[in-house]
């Protein structure tokens, strides 16, 4: 039996109770789960998660992650930055004018995951965030545009759907993928391409799809080469 490529966590939040709904996120999450399973990842997944359920799922993932040399997190849904920190927005989020109360009671900090990655530099740690959608209706006095830059710790690559402090584009059609996830799905299965080169191709595709309005961005401190799809020439020839 072929060894597992790694462990992936896929979270897709689309059906928000109070914020703008994100129709493409459900398909984005489902399609990413399928392609990661095809690439031989074990996948833990959840969709339309409330805050408590998000923390529970992340905790489950981190407990199992100790057993894998490669871990990947893919999140699609609303994401926000507050005072230089990035947060996932659960579907039951209720806006509060107080930053402290809002962050402590309504959001899920991505540092719940990035702290684990930083503490495990011997792993290949990958975080992919298709979460820089338009402001979900929060006051700009509290919430900034898009997500803020995150410095990847040793052994980590963090990929954003668009540049820091910018918003990403997506269709309102639930049968379509976002520009970023569409490009990611098209490129992640390409055989024998290093992860950094794969994300360059994703960036070029998104720039074309968005007429230059959206430019994906990565921050990487990976310390070893990583390929999502390693195939022999015979295996490639069989698919042609």
Stretch-by-stretch model annotation:
Residues 1-240:
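Cysteine endopeptidase catalytic domains of the caspase/legumain-like
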């Amino acid at each position: 039996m072929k060894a597992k490529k790694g462990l992936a966590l896929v979270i897709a939040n689309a059906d928000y109770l109070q914020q703008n709904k994100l129709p493409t996120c459900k398909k984005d999450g489902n399609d990413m789960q399928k392609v990661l399973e095809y690439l031989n990842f074990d996948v833990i997944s959840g969709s339309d998660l409330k805050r408590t359920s998000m923390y529970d799922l992340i905790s489950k993932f981190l407990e199992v992650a100790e057993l894998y040399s490669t871990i990947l997190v893919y999140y699609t849904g609303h994401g926000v930055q507050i005072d230089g920190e990035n947060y996932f927005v659960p579907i039951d989020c209720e806006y509060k004018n107080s930053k402290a109360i809002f962050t402590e009671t309504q959001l899920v900090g991505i540092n719940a995951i990035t702290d684990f990655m930083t503490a495990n530099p011997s792993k290949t740690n990958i975080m992919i965030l298709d979460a820089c959608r338009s402001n979900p209706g929060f006051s700009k006095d509290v919430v900034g545009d898009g997500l803020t830059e995150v410095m990847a710790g040793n052994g980590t690559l963090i990929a954003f759907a668009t540049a820091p402090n910018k918003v990403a584009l997506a269709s309102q059609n639930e049968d379509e993928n976002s520009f970023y996830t569409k490009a990611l799905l098209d490129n992640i299965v390409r055989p024998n391409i290093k992860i950094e080169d794969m994300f360059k191709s994703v960036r070029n595709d998104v720039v074309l799809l968005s007429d230059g309005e959206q430019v994906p961005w990565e921050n990487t401190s990976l310390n070893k080469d990583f390929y999502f799809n390693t195939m022999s020439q015979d295996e490639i020839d069989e698919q042609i």
